[in-house]
Amino acid sequence: MKFNLIIEQLDELIQSHSLTTNPDCNPDITQLAPLDEALSGHLSFIEGDKFASMIAKTNASALILPLNETLQTQATQQGIAWIATANPRLLFAHTIRLFYQPFRPSPGIHPTAVIDPDAQLGENVSIGANVVIQAGVKLGNEVCIHPNVVIYPGVTLGDRTILHGNCTIHERTVIGADCVIHSGAVIGSEGFGFVPTAEGWFKTEQSGITVLEDGVEVGCNSTIDRPAVGETRVKRNTKIDNLTHIAHGCQIGENCAFAAQVGLAGGVKVGNRVILAGQVGVANQAKIGDGAIASAQTGIPNDVAAGEIVSGSPCVPNKLYLKVSAIYKRLPEMYQALKQIQKQLEKNS
């Protein structure tokens, strides 16, 4: 595909991003590639000035650049076609869609699927091999269900939602439109509810509901539990990575992003636009305010204020954590120095 044709197809996005181009270069682009692996015919991107030195080393035929005249001049001198925008990563993400579309089977129902007569199917649905759809299930239009998915009674799926292979959607679950549930995920499973008695643990039945609003994405082998009463809710456009657990009764805001192996205990409330990096753990009933960020492996035992950045376990403000970490590396030497001071004090006393 000619580079100028790529620009034309991105025209609507370009107009909204104050984009500039190098009109004198129009190479054939055959694929996209990382900057350090790109060859002739490849398109890559540079997100910030720190990668400027790589322009001289890359073999890419075209680059998506930030709005930086120095980088643009450098690319031109290298004979590299370029397009510059305020958000190179976003433009690159849109460009990928010109070269790649995820696999989606044609509408139809595989003959091995087991569908209860009481289930309601929308138009142009795709249902793969060995899928089980139980009574009272409602599927919206253009829903895509890959092989070996099990959907319990009464579940609702919104338009264009995709369930990848081997997912399980339990009863009392509502999933909105344009959601993606990746392979092995379990949505609406029983929350961990047991009451201690003299005889042992007494099971609390989980009669609540689980709601995923429109645009939610759940990664492979992640689990979202339903509560004993009330609801577990993940709000619009939140993205959840692989191997993440959201316990019963959690309330997750809009446009959050949780990386792999995040674990939320029961009743946690998370605001909008919260970012939790890998292996963050959040204790029971903790509240996290809008826009907060927790770095990898942070342990959150209590509430976190809106906009706060926290690190460590138990968590502290990130700036304090960095100072403590710098001191931590010097503790052996500091300990030896302290021992010498103690000896000197004892000698002088």
Swiss-Prot record:
Q: In which pathway does it act?
A: Bacterial outer membrane biogenesis; LPS lipid A biosynthesis
Please provide the record's keywords in A-Z order.
Acyltransferase, Lipid A biosynthesis, Lipid biosynthesis, Lipid metabolism, Repeat, Transferase
Q: Which reaction does it catalyse?
A: a UDP-3-O-[(3R)-3-hydroxyacyl]-alpha-D-glucosamine + a (3R)-hydroxyacyl-[ACP] = a UDP-2-N,3-O-bis[(3R)-3-hydroxyacyl]-alpha-D-glucosamine + holo-[ACP] + H(+)
CDD domains reported for this sequence = LbH_LpxD
Q: Which InterPro entries match?
A: Hexapep, LpxD, Trimer_LpxA-like_sf, UDP_GlcNAc_AcTrfase_non-rep
Q: Where is the active site?
A: H248
One Pfam family, please name it.
Answer: LpxD
- TM region positions: none
Keyword Nucleotidyltransferase present in the record's keywords: the answer is no
- One Gene Ontology MF term: N-acyltransferase activity
Which is one Gene Ontology cellular component term of this protein?
Answer: membrane
Which cysteines in this chain are paired by disulphide bridges?
Answer: none
GO biological processes:
lipid A biosynthetic process
HAMAP family linked to this entry: LpxD
The family line of this record is:
Belongs to the transferase hexapeptide repeat family. LpxD subfamily.
What protein am I looking at? Answer: UDP-3-O-acylglucosamine N-acyltransferase
Native source organism of the sequence = Gloeothece citriformis (strain PCC 7424) (Cyanothece sp. (strain PCC 7424))
Gene giving rise to this polypeptide? lpxD
